[in-house]
Amino acid sequence: MASPRHPVSAHAVALVQMDRLQTFAFSVCWSDNSDTFVRRSWDEFRQLQKTLKKTFPVEAGLLRRSEQVLPKLPDAPLLTRRGHTGRGLVRLRLLDTYVQALLATSEHILRSSALHGFFVPKPLDLEPMLPPGSLVILPTPEEPLSQPRGSLDIHSLEAQSIPCVQPFHTLDIRDRPFHTKAQEILDILLRHPSGWWLVENKDQQVAWFPAPYLEEVATCQGQESGLALQGSGRQFCTTQAYEGSRSDELSVPSGARVHVLETSDRGWWLCRYNGRTGLLPAMSLQPEGLGSLLGRPGFPDSAGADKVAEDRTIPPVVPTRPCMSAIQSRCCSITRRALGQEQGTRVPR
C-alpha cells in the first residue's frame, strides 16, 4: 500500500551508544519537504532488508538476479579496529551507503508502507532527551591520501588551564586510568580538529580528552546557540500530526521540526515550518532532543548564558578519536618524543 508521504533522501549523522546498545541516527527528508531525525538499531535495519525482500521478490533478485535493484546490506568485519565503537562507526558508514542506494531505487519502493513505517518517527525518536549515559559520536570524514604540503591539522600552544564541564573517564597515553571531576582544571597541551585535545592533569598524567567537556568550548557553543536563536526561533518537534482548520494555522506531520517564533499562555504558538508561518497547538510541541544535539554539537539550543548550567545536565557530544597514524603524520619529531610515541605509547582506544 502506498503512503501519501514518503522519504526522498536520508543520510547518517551520528552513532548513539549506551553501554553495549548502539543505534544509528539518520536525518530524513520527506516528499512534503519536512525533515526528521530517527534512530534505528542494526537489527532493525536487518529486519527492514528482510521485509523488503519479502515484499519485492522481483526487485530483490530472488527470481532473476539480473532484475535486482534492491541494494545488499553488508556488515562490518568482526575484527574491526578500535573494538565495539569502531565497528559501530564502520556500520554507520555502511548504512549511509545502503540507505542512499535504497532511496535511489524505483518509485513504488519509496512509496511502500514498509519503507514509510521504518523511517517515520517513533515515540522514542520524539523524546526531548536521550537516555542517561548515552554518547553521541559524530563520524569524521575520510581523510584524503595526500594533503597540501605545509598544512597542519594539530595546533600547539602554551599550556592553558581550562576546567571540565562534567566528569569523564578515559585512558592516558600510557594506558593508565584518567579520571576527571566537574570543574577540575586541566592544562591544554595540543588541540586537534577532531575534537580530542591533549591535556595534562595535576598528577602530570597526559591524555587525549574530548573538547566539548571543557569549559571554554562549552561556553562558546552556548553563546553561538543563543545568537542563532534570536534570528531563527527555537527548534521544537511535533509529537503528533496536526491538520490546520483555519488560514492562520499550520498543517504538520508527526515528528516534524518547526521553529517556534513566539509562545503564548493561550495554548497556541506562532511557528515557522516549510517556509510558512502560522499557529500550532502548544500541546503538540516539545523541545528537540537528538536534533538539537546533532544540529549544534555539544549542547542543545540555549536562550543565552543563563541556561548554560542547566544545559550541562546533558552529556556533551564525544567526537570520534583521531587515529594513531593521523596524529603521528602531523607531529614533528620533538612532539613525538614529548608524547613518548617513539617509546611505543599510543593514543588510547
UniProtKB/Swiss-Prot annotation:
Residues 315-324 are annotated as: Proline-rich region. GO terms for biological process: extracellular matrix disassembly; superoxide metabolic process. Disulfide bonds: none annotated. Keywords: Cell membrane, Lipid-binding, Membrane, Repeat, SH3 domain. It is a peripheral membrane protein. Residues 160-219, 231-290 form the SH3 domain. The keyword Repeat applies. PROSITE patterns: PX, SH3. Strongly expressed by colon epithelial cells and to a lower extent in small intestine, uterus, stomach and testis. Expressed in different parts of the inner ear including sensory and nonsensory cell layers of the saccule, ampullae of the semicircular canals, the stria vascularis and the spiral glanglion neurons. It is found in: Cell membrane. InterPro entries: NADPH_Oxidase/PX-Domain (IPR051228), NoxO1_SH3_2 (IPR035758), PX_dom (IPR001683), PX_dom_sf (IPR036871), SH3-like_dom_sf (IPR036028), SH3_domain (IPR001452). SMART domains: SH3 (SM00326). GO terms for cellular component: NADPH oxidase complex; plasma membrane. Pfam families: PX, SH3_1. Disruption phenotype: Mice display balance defects being unable to orient themselves with respect to the gravitational force. This is associated with a defect in otoconia biogenesis in the inner ear. Residues 1-126 form the PX domain. GO terms for molecular function: enzyme binding; phosphatidylinositol binding; superoxide-generating NADPH oxidase activator activity. Gene3D superfamilies: Phox-like domain, SH3 Domains. Interacts with NOX1, NOXA1 and NCF2/p67phox. Interacts with SH3PXD2A and SH3PXD2B. Interacts with CYBA/p22phox. Constitutively potentiates the superoxide-generating activity of NOX1 and NOX3 and is required for the biogenesis of otoconia/otolith, which are crystalline structures of the inner ear involved in the perception of gravity. Isoform 3 is more potent than isoform 1 in activating NOX3. Together with NOXA1, may also substitute to NCF1/p47phox and NCF2/p67phox in supporting the phagocyte NOX2/gp91phox superoxide-generating activity. The PX domain mediates lipid-binding, localization to the plasma membrane and is required for NOX1 activation. This is NADPH oxidase organizer 1.
